[in-house]
Amino acid sequence: MNDSKDAPKSYDFDLIIIGGGSGGLAAAKEAAKFDKKVMVLDFVTPTPLGTRWGLGGTCVNVGCIPKKLMHQAALLGQALKDSRNYGWKLEDTVKHDWEKMTESVQNHIGSLNWGYRVALREKKVVYENAYGKFIGPHKIMATNNKGKEKVYSAERFLIATGERPRYLGIPGDKEYCISSDDLFSLPYCPGKTLVVGASYVALECAGFLAGIGLDVTVMVRSILLRGFDQDMANKIGEHMEEHGIKFIRQFVPTKIEQIEAGTPGRLKVTAKSTNSEETIEDEFNTVLLAVGRDSCTRTIGLETVGVKINEKTGKIPVTDEEQTNVPYIYAIGDILEGKLELTPVAIQAGRLLAQRLYGGSTVKCDYDNVPTTVFTPLEYGCCGLSEEKAVEKFGEENIEVYHSFFWPLEWTVPSRDNNKCYAKVICNLKDNERVVGFHVLGPNAGEVTQGFAAALKCGLTKQQLDSTIGIHPVCAEIFTTLSVTKRSGGDILQSGCUG
C-alpha cells in the first residue's frame, strides 16, 4: 500500500495509541515527556453478559490485579486455618463473603482507573473513550459508545489493543457461561463451578475459588499449562487435586443448557471425550471458560492500511523495534506474534519504543529470560527455559538439572504440605554450568523469582549459586544448597527446614 496516497499534509497528533492498557498507557506517558502531542483511544466492548470496565486494560480491570487480590483472599483462608496451631482461638466457623470481596476489589480497581485518567491529563495526553479503526493512511475513525464518529490523523500509530477471552462456539456458551472478564465483578457467589481450560487463567481462578470454599471442577482437554515446564505443571495439578479440586481430563464441553435461572442458577453441561465416543453430563451453578484468548486485531481496519497479521491467530508480526510492515504503525503487548503475553513486557516495550521514537535511544526490549509467576494455590515462579525447551535447545546430554523438595518453616507447625514445594535449576554443561532455567513451586514464588531473574540476566552459574550464602530460614535458600541432579536419581525429600 502506498502510504503517501491520501495521507494528510499535516497531522492532528504525533502519536495515536489504540488501546488504554498497560502497554499503551506506558507508551503514551513516555512519549508525552518529549512534548509530543499524544492521543489514547480506549474502548471496552462489553462481554456477552454485558460486563465492561474503565481505563487500564486487562491487567488492572480483569487480570493480574483482581486475580492476585482474590488469590490473597484464598491464602488468608488458609492462614486462618493454620492460625489455630499457632495459638489463635477462632470461636465461630469462619465464612467467606463473596459480595464483600468483590466490592473491595472493585473499589480498588476504580481508584486505579481514576488514577490513570488523572495521570494522562497531567501529562497533557488526550484520552477518548472511543473505538479506533483505521480508515486510510495516517487516519483513524474514533466511535464512542453513543455512535458519534470523529476522524483523527497522526504521524505515527501504536496498536496496543490486547486480547479478550475465547468462547467455545458450542450451544449455550455465550448465553450461560462466564469468562475471566466477568468473574472478578460477578455480583453473586458463583457456587459450584466448572472451569473449562488448563491455562494459567483457568488454574488460578480454580485455585482461588476452591480456596474460598467453593466446589470446583476443572475440565482439561489435553495438558496443564501448555508452554510451561510440564514437570512443574503436573506438580501444580497434583497439589490442586490433593486440596479438593476435581479434574475431568481429556474431555471438552459440547453443550451448555440452563436448568434454572437465577444468581447463580443451575446449568447442565454435556461433554465429550477427546479420545473416545464417551459423553458425560453434570450440573453446575457456574461455568467459567478459560480456554485461551484472541487478539483484538481483526476489526480495527488493519487491512485498510495494509498491516499484515497472522490470519490464523490474529497476531501481528513486528521487527525487533516493534514496527509492523507499515513503517508508521507499531504494535506492542499481547497481540505480538511470538512474544510473551505479560503486562510488564508490554510496559517495558511501550516505554522503550517511545524513547527510541522521540528520545534518541537505541535500547530495544529484551524478550529473553523474562520472569513470571502463576498464582495457583501453590505459586509457581519461573525464569528462562523449561526443561523441555532446554533439552530441545542444548540436547539432554548437555544439561544438568539440580532439584529438591522443600518444606517452608511456617507450614511445619500446622504440619501441612510436606514435600510439595519444589525447586529446580537447569544448567548448560557446555557453558560453565550457566543457569538457563529457574523454577520454584512454593509460597511467594514471585518474590523469590524476581531477584534470581536479575542474576540470570547477569549470566548466573551453578558455582555462583553454590557460593552464595543463604538466608535462614526462608524458602529461597534452597537454591544455594541444591546438590542432587535428576540424572543421579538421588533422594530429594526434605525431613525438616534445616536438612
Swiss-Prot record:
Its EC number is 1.8.1.9, 1.11.1.2. Disulfide bonds join C59-C64. The active site is at H472. The keyword NADP applies. One of its GO terms (molecular function) is mercury ion binding. Changing U498S: Loss of activity. ISGylated. Its cofactor is FAD. NADP(+) binds at residues 166, 198-204, 221-222, 226-228, 291-293, 315, 341. The modification Phosphotyrosine is found at Y131. The active site is a redox-active disulfide bond. The selenocysteine residue is also essential for catalytic activity. Belongs to the class-I pyridine nucleotide-disulfide oxidoreductase family. NCBIfam families: TGR (TIGR01438). Reduces disulfideprotein thioredoxin (Trx) to its dithiol-containing form. Homodimeric flavoprotein involved in the regulation of cellular redox reactions, growth and differentiation. Contains a selenocysteine residue at the C-terminal active site that is essential for catalysis. Also has reductase activity on hydrogen peroxide (H2O2). This is Thioredoxin reductase 1, cytoplasmic.
